[in-house]
Structure formats: structure tokens, C-alpha cells
Amino acid sequence: MLRARKGLWVLLSVLLAFWIERAISFPVRHHKRSRNGVYVENQVQNHLADSHPHQRRWLQHHSTGVLPLPEPEEESKPFVLDFKNLPDLANADIGSQNPNIQVTIEVLDDPPMDVEMDLVKEWSNDWSTSSPSSTVEWLGGKKLFWPLFWGYTDADSGEDGTGQAEDEEDDYDYDSGEPIPSGLGKTDGDWTHNRYEEKEEEWSTWSPCSVTCGHGNQTRSRSCGDFCTSTESQSCDLVPCPDDWNSVGHVFPFEMENGTEPYGTDVGSCEKWLNCKSEFLQRYLQQVFTELPNCPCSYPSHVSNNIVSLLDVGHERSFQWRDASGPKERLDIYKPSARSCLRSGLSKNGTTLAAQHCCYDDNKQLITRGKGAGTPNLISTEFSPELHFKVDVLPWILCKGDWSRFHAVRPPNNGLHCMENPQQDIFMNELEEAREY
């Protein structure tokens, strides 16, 4: 009996110890009654909270009911190295077993570095959305993307991005002392390009004619930047040289009346020119007289140094005209009684290279006859001043200035039926002088 009681107490002790242990390990709820009889439930306290601080912080963070958004993962794209885009590697033989190519690729996984220049901070808006991890310090990582900056000058080595020495000075001035690669946007530094700041210089005056007689050239120039000079050239026609008075070697391919004898250099060259029966010339002259505009009856005052468009009633359309009274026209020799002249421009729809030539007196009235009248130009100076001289001026010289004989082949234009000018008595005097000359 005693043994049974003792065994029972041992069993009860074990059960009591087990129950106490379970009671201690089970979470305890504390209740507090309010005055209105409503029970308020406190938060459950876990005895493991003190031993795991990170779990407690997690509970406190999520107690607000707001879950943090997961950080977006950047899409990783494969890096493609295209040798065709790299000048120094374009001709490399990558098919051989050991190609002579050395490529350095640097990967930065560290946190963003402090940039020592304001270059990255002031990039344009296109770069503002990029993540901080994509920012590369220019001073520390200038060789990371070296193919993009071939012109970058290394102050220490004196070489550019390709490893070759820089021979020419950079045209850019930058107050930070470091050259800036192109295409990186605006910076705080005050940098300008010398070439675009310079104002375009004025043209110099025309140089004297390269010859003292006959046909020559004159030039003018202006600066277009460092080590650059722009030059323009134009022809200048002076008094024909003595050797040119009878020279007809390069005139239109005219044929003589008998079709066999070419132009000579004898005294009868004018007669040979007058008696030319070239079929080509006849067709060309007919086309010229048909297409060219009629001479205006008065000289337009606003045409000086300008190109004007004037309506031609006979052709029912407008033609462009320009002044032809400059010094190189030598009106004092070829049109002695004219004060000013006009020359029509080449037409886009025209089938010839000719131009109408009209001259005017002191009263700006068209000279329709006599020594000052203009005649059609078979070759416009707008197309070729050299050919114009040989085709339109040289025949006048061959006839020794006898305009009456010249006008028999190239009659002055008066298609608008302007008043005859000069008057009859003056015209007869000029005609007598020309024949006696």
C-alpha cells in the first residue's frame, strides 16, 4: 500500500512538472476590463522576441499594414563587341588562333562614386532618368568606354584615345583644364568653339587683272578660319592685244561660202565672217531670235546691282535681267554712245546659251540703231565669258568696229517697236563715220 502511494506521488509530480513546463512555454494573454465592461485584448507577447531582434523589427515594420514595393530588377542585356565600329580593330584578323587583339573590360559593382567634376551632374535630361549605378566617374573611368572618345587627350601620356600622339591643338577652350568629349551635353564650364565664334570676314578687293590686254583673270580672298583661305576668281576683258585683231582660230566652226576655206588672218576676215553659210549657225541664230526676250523700251532704275524680273508681252511671260554696264563690259569701246546696258539671264526652258543685250542712252531710252545699240549674244557671259568673247566680241574686232556690217548679221532687237533712237540725222552721221573708218 505504501509503495502504491509513493508511485502515485511520483506520477503526479511528473505530470505536474510537465504541465508547468507546458504552461510556461504557452503564450499568455492579458485582459483588462474597462469601465464599460468591454474587454480589450492586448497584443500577444512572444518570449522569443528578445532573442530574435530582426523578427521584432519585421513585425513592427508590417504593423502599419503597408508592404514595401519590391525593387525593380534591371534587365540584363548581353554585351556585344562589334569590331567593325572600332577603327583600330576593323581590319583585325579574328579568325586566326591567336589574333593580335587586346581588349580590357572593367565591371563596376561598387556603390556610386563621388564625381570630382560637374560633368555627370549636369548631363542633359536624356541622362537624368538613368540609375545612379550607371554613372561612371570620368576622371577615374575614362578608359572604360575608350572607343567612344577617340579624341580624348591624356595629359600624362600626351596621347589620344587611340594611343597616337596628338599633333594639333584642340579648338575647344574649357575653364576646368580638362578636355570635354563631344556629345555629353551641357556643363557649367564656360567653353566655346573658336571656329564658330569668329565672324565671317569680308571679301578683299579684287586684284588687278592678270593681263594688260586681252582676256585675263582677277581674284579676291577672305579668311574662313585657322589655316583656311577662300578665294574667288572672275574674268576680266581688257583692250584686245594686237595679235588678237586678226586671230579667229577658235571662233564658231563657220564654213566659207565655198565650204572649203577656213577663216584666215588676212585683211578680209570680216568679209569671210559676213559670208559664212554655216547651216548650224543659221539654225542657231533662228532659235536665238525666237527664244530671246524683247528689249525693254526704257532702262529700269531698280536693276542696278540686282536681278529683276520683267514681263515680256510678246512672249507672255517674265524674264530675268541684270545690269551689264560694269567696267569689264567696256562700253566706251564696243558701245560708245551707250550709258548703260542690260543682259537677259539664261532660261531654264531655253534651248540655247544665248542672251539678249540691250543698251540705253543718257535718258535711259533704248538705243535701237547705230554704234551704241546692243545685239544678241550667241553665248551668254553667265555661261562662259571666254566663249562669249570669242563668239560675240571678236567678230566685231575683225570688222574693225564697223558696226554697220556687224549689225547686218546681228541686228539689234526692237521687238516692242520702241521709238527709233538716235534720230535719223545722228544715225546717218554715225553710219558715215563707220564706213570711212
Curated annotation (Swiss-Prot):
Chief subcellular location: secreted
The name this protein goes by in its record: Isthmin-2
Domain AMOP: 262-425
The keyword Signal is assigned to this record: yes
Key words, A-Z: Disulfide bond, Glycoprotein, Secreted, Signal
Glycosylation sites: 217, 258, 349
PROSITE patterns, per the entry: AMOP, TSP1
Family: Belongs to the isthmin family.
N-terminal signal peptide: 1-25
Biased composition (Acidic residues): 165-176
Residues in TSP type-1 domain copies: 197-242
GO cellular component, one term: extracellular region
InterPro entries: AMOP_dom, Angio_Inhib/Adhesion_GPCR, TSP1_rpt, TSP1_rpt_sf
Coiled-coil residue windows: none
Region annotation Disordered: where it falls in the sequence: 156-191
